[in-house]
């Protein structure tokens, strides 16, 4: 008898990780709003604390509602396990703290989320961890930057702010040749557009606040373990390959095999750092996961319509998106992102900083704020907001022109989005 066909992405989005409550028979995932869980007896408690059996002890470490979200994300990303955190930045910090120690080194793409850049540039050096940044298209640069103390390579599926498409298979090859794992932030793509673990990455990170949650109502992060990196053979990761006194001398690579990284991240990281996701936020984010495929299809449809409009508008100097033939990574996007290259569009408004400010102040339907990945269309002009303290030269050095407008394309009717952008562009050109 042939093996059953694995469920499709849309089906996993709705069903993975959940077994309906046998007592209440609730079809929806319940919110287990509790801090702690009853033990059957002393032996049961001891087994849980020694990591000898599955179960819940305290919601800082695990929770039944959050566990459904974790298992579902692991299924969507083709991983062996996941840990959810209070935010995307908590997930990034947790990954690094699980693998690296003082004296270790990271090689990272220079096109990363600003919070990640700040963590790597300013915060981690205080703890003895340094980073070398490399342009995301510079494969030789990645190779040259890896040294004897390098323990992690970091990149984003779609870079920020240039929307560079990371060549995940080739960067993974470079990292693995040095016995180092590749961590990819897949926030901008979501597993609907890209599954980095299937392309060679070892760990995937998300700010699930963004498109996965999709509605701007809950903050959360996630780490997904691909389970394919051999931590013991590498010889560079004592946190996984050597006895850990914090859990009675357990060797995570021996006890948990392919899931050793994600188990250490949970057992030590959530226990000691405490950046756990609340069960209520896990519930809210699960609602987003259930409609992820449908929403991403609409995001891609609307993004194409917005791009077609912007390219023809006389008030626009340039448009940036990997789906456009003018983008340097267009061919790579077609290969690695066949379902679409994300819902972030950048463009330059004629008239520079002053015109950009007029545009932002003229939008009516679009929301002027600093988030991305909402169901609603969001816009921002960095030169008059997030980067307003910089002059033209400093902005250029940061890759943020005075004329740059960033649009996170939402789910409204495409015609309504375009009408709003059109009237704001007209306003931007008035004296």
Predicted regions and their residues:
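Conserved PLP-enzyme active-site core in the AAT-like
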Residues: 2-3, 13-15, 19-22, 82-312
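N-terminal "arm"/small-domain region of PLP-dependent enzymes with the aminotransferase-like
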Residues: 2-63, 71-72
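Conserved N-terminal alpha-helix of the aminotransferase class I/II PLP-enzyme fold
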Residues: 41-93, 115-123
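Glycine-centered tight turns that cap/initiate beta-strands
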Residues: 78, 149, 315-318, 365, ...
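PLP-dependent enzyme catalytic core of the Aspartate aminotransferase-like
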Residues: 121, 130, 148-151, 295, ...
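Short hydrophobic/aromatic beta-strand micro-patches
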Residues: 224, 346-348, 408-410
């Amino acid at each position: 008898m042939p093996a059953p066909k694995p469920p499709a992405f849309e089906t996993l989005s709705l069903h993975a990780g959940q077994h309906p409550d046998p007592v209440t028979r609730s079809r929806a995932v319940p919110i287990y709003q509790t801090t702690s869980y009853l033990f059957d007896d002393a032996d049961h408690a001891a087994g849980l604390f020694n990591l000898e059996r599955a179960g819940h002890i305290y919601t800082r470490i695990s929770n039944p509602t959050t566990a459904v979200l974790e298992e579902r994300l692991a299924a969507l990303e083709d991983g062996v396990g996941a840990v959810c955190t209070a935010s995307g930045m908590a997930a990034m910090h947790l990954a690094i703290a699980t693998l690296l120690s003082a004296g270790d080194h990271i090689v990272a793409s220079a096109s990363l989320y600003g919070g990640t850049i700040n963590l790597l540039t300013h915060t981690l050096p205080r703890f003895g961890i340094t980073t070398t940044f490399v342009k995301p298209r510079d494969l030789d640069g990645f190779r040259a930057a890896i040294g004897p103390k390098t323990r992690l390579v970091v990149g984003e599926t779609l870079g920020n702010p240039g929307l560079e498409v990371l060549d995940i298979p080739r960067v993974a090859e470079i990292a693995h040749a040095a016995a180092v794992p590749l961590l990819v932030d897949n926030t901008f793509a979501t597993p609907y557009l890209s599954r980095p673990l299937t392309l060679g990455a070892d760990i995937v990170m998300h700010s699930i606040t963004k498109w996965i949650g999709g509605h701007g109502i809950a903050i959360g992060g996630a780490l997904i373990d691909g389970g394919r990196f051999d931590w013991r053979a590498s010889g560079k990761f004592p946190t996984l390959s050597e006895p850990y006194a914090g859990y009675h001398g357990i060797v995570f690579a021996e006890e948990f095999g392919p899931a050793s990284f994600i188990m250490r991240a949970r057992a030590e990281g959530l226990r000691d750092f405490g950046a756990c996701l609340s069960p209520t936020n896990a519930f809210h984010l699960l609602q987003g996961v259930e409609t992820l495929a449908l929403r991403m299809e609409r995001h891609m449809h609307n993004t194409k319509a917005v791009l077609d409009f912007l390219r023809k508008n006389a008030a626009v100097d340039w448009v940036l998106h990997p789906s456009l033939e003018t983008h340097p990574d267009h061919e790579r996007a077609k290969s690695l992102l066949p379902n679409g290259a994300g819902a972030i569009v950048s463009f330059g408004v004629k008239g520079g900083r002053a015109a950009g400010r007029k545009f932002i102040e003229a939008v009516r339907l679009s929301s002027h704020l600093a988030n991305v990945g909402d169901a609603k269309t969001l816009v921002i002009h960095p030169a008059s907001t997030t980067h307003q303290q910089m002059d033209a030269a400093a902005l250029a050095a940061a890759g943020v022109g005075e004329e740059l407008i960033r649009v996170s394309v939402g789910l409204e009717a495409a015609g309504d989005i375009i009408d709003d952008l059109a009237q704001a562009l007209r306003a931007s050109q008035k004296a």
